[in-house]
Amino acid sequence: MLAYYVVKFFSWIMCVAPKCLRNLTAAILGGIAVVATPKWRMQMAAANIQECLGVDKARAQQIAEKSLRRFGRMVVEVMRFPLLNKDNITKLVNVEGLEYLEEAYKQNKGVIIATGHFGNWELLGATIALHGYPMLSITRKQNNKYLSLIHI
């Protein structure tokens, strides 16, 4: 239960904090992610990046580390979701091809959107919902049942 309140409090802080503090927090969280990630996981990530992108080992390691550093920014962005509305989400997300969703939705058969687990994909669901489309996301339950109470 404590974790739930800590996350909610952190979310509130990130919602009221000035941009410079949010950027600092994101940088610190990203740095912690780099240091806290086990070496074997970083090596596996770099190997996968190297294979998929065809880059050399040094570049793959650089991309893996940059991805972890970006994680801090993503956490701060997610903590600010309570502030999102249809008007301001367009400053964060550039929507292209919404007409295809509209066309599929008008067929009244439902629409399934599959996405990869990269970047701040949580913004996709928020963006679509704020454009008036009903959303249902399928995710794994959190290990901490109280954290499952937090809806993004």
Predicted regions span which residues?
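A transmembrane-helix-recognition feature enriched in membrane-embedded lipid enzymes
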Residues: M1-A47, E51, K66-K86
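Conserved small/polar residues in nucleotide/adenosyl-binding loops
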Residues: I150-I152
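A short, well-structured juxtamembrane/interface segment
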Residues: P82-V111, G119
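Histidine-anchored nucleotide/phosphate-binding helix
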Residues: N120-L130
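Short internal beta-strands
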Residues: S137-Q142
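Short, flexible loop segments at boundaries between secondary-structure elements
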Residues: K145-Y146
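Active-site pocket-lining segments that scaffold enzyme catalytic pockets across diverse folds
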Residues: G116
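Membrane-interface alpha-helices at helix entry/exit sites of multi-pass transporters
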Residues: R59-I63
